[in-house]
Amino acid sequence: KVREPMKMSEPMKRILALSLSLLLVLTLLPAGALAVDTYTTSVEGVRMIEEFEGFSSTAYADNGKWYIGYGTLCEPSDYPNGISELEADQLMRDALVVAEDVVNNLLMDYSISVTQYQFDAMVSMTYNLGTQWIVPEYRFCGYLISGIWQYTETEVVNAIATWCHQGSMVRESLVNRRLREAYLFLYGQYDNAGPDNYTYIHYSPNGGTVE
């Protein structure tokens, strides 16, 4: 005998239809639209960046650009009377929004999940470097996209620390900052304890070139 197909109740039909509709919506969504948390910089992250940048009440020139407060871009004539630390803090927080958006967009575009302290480390890099490191062909960005867990501590530290040049020159202050950011990214430590575990070698060509 051939069995008749089981009849579905109306509630079951509605549940099945809803489930199929939801599955279709999820299938049509791009990968970056799936749930990825967005972040803002933590209080600890802000303090760390301010420590890196140092405070200047008046505008100063660095590498052809003008800055004030905690390393915030400005025009040389913007603040003729200088600014207070409180004003500098607000200027930096306003500027951080741009860096936060850049990092959040990277995370959403590639469905990358990170912790708060990893986000803070990337925002610190972006505030200092701009977006130049956010290129998939560059190591750190590529590691994030392909899965940072696949790489060793040394590989991650080297990928971050390579961003230590001003022009063609290595700056020790940038090396130290990158090592702090790398340690924060890996271990969530906002203080200066970790980078003592790292050693770097700076080759000087003494007038020649290093290959």
Regions found by a protein language model. Give the residues of each.
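Substrate-binding/active-site groove segments that recognize
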Residues: A61-N81
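Hydrophobic core
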Residues: L20, L24-L28
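Extracytoplasmic
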Residues: E44, N63-K65, Y117-F119
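Structural recognition of the beta-strand scaffold that forms the well-ordered cores
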Residues: M48, Y67-G69, A121-T126, E155-V156
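Bacterial N-terminal signal peptides that target proteins for export
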Residues: K7-S19
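Long, amphipathic alpha-helical surface segments
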Residues: V36-S57, T72, L86-D89, R93-D94, ...
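Sec-dependent signal peptide cleavage junction
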Residues: L28-D37
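Alpha-helical segment that forms one wall of the substrate-binding/catalytic cleft
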Residues: Y79-Y110, V114-I134
